Amino acid sequence: METYEKIHEFLGNAPYVTEEHLRTVSESYLRHPGKALRPRLMGLCCEAAGGNSEATLSAGAAVEMFHTWSLMHDDIIDHDALRRGHPTAHVTGAQLGRDNLHLSDECAKDYGEALAILGGDLLLTHAIGCMTEAFPSLGLRMCRKLAPELLSGEQLDIRLSYLPWNQLSEELIWEMMRGKTGALFAFAAECGVSIAQGISPEDSPLARTLAKFASDCGLAFQLADDLLGIFGEEAKFGKPIGSDIREGKRTLLMLRTWNSASPEEQRRLESILGNSRATVEEIEWVREFIQKHGVRTQIESEAEKILTEAIQSLESALPPTPPRNQLRIWAESLVKRVK
């Protein structure tokens, strides 16, 4: 867990956060580490370009903090109560409001959301600071390129949630996934190459190739994540199964489910998707519908196809070396978790 050790080292040297609740909430997800997929990707891309992955530790910590702030804000937007099997940042903040300030439930909810927004903002500044101290040009790239791409994808996700299903297109959903998920994977990959080669990602053909490989892997990862959100095990997934149905998330999985339904079935789907009070029986009906109409198999095949093509591009770009083999294993792990 070198990435998280580096993060805690950096945060330990950040003396300006003195407000107890803000520190507690901003660091809440870091106390329950994720898989650190993006720092691992960065280190492997650095090695593939002839560098030493140790050189990416600070940049990897920055990318993981960047990823974490986006999760905090995303959980507020999606009204999620669990992340990695633990209360989300705004839920943690609300509990602090009840316990320490004796707030009513309504006021505590507002307090928790405000804390999580500020906590996410704080982690974003830490991410940029950590990257800029180590690699100034990559810190600037994080601000000028990565952040707008990711935020555009997030906003498109929000906008799509207000569109009727019959006005959605697969193109819009792919665009959303490329911004919301693919951009950070691509950034991690190009940073690894840039650190190894000592040049800007724009000046490195290998950085561009591995960024495309990583972005495509991110798309496969997102498709797998969407499947886990409906068919996974809550204890392993760390979030309530079926929450995407109750939230009416506009995913490729659910759009294809909608498009495979008859008008009568669409009316029933419309009464369930986005209904926070949908019953367990209704959620199960949607799950069975997805299975029966082969949509689950379609999405699994789509993820496998994207991953296979990404690995082929990787193997065309790099000679057979241990880092290339590790990148292939890393990529395969993104989809393997749904099998």
Show where each model-derived region lies.
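All-alpha prenyltransferase/terpene-synthase fold signal
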Residues: 1-339
